Amino acid sequence: MIKVETLGMYDIAKINPVLKSANDVVNNSFLTVGGITYVILNDINGDDAYKDGVVIKAGEYLNGYDLSAWAGQKLVIDEKHITYASGDDYDDITAGTTLLKPKTDGTLEVTSTAPESGVYFKVTDKVTLTGKAVKVLIMGV
């Protein structure tokens, strides 16, 4: 699960109203299109509303929130959205130090250096959402 830290973030949100993906996309993931990084937060109804890993089929519209509009704000992200280097895990994340960057598969990976361009995140706190989670500051925009 990926959540905004404060509801006021929706007041300044930038949504691409015509964003579609050429491939299937998992809800609650990250997607970069045309150099813009989005967090995909579609509203899901019915039986799938509270399930993890709900797939939005290729060609369907996406609620893609442009992360550049939220620079300096925070997201809360479950650990399941983070990939680690071999042998590393949640215990290796250090608040105030660990950096994360989006991967092409929609998850975030731990990185030791900030990318030269594009959105990345700095872990500010370790918290609990539906399990182990982190609060991240949106940076690099």
Predicted stretch roles:
Residues 1-141:
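Surface-exposed, low-hydrophobicity beta-strand/loop segments enriched in small/polar/acidic residues
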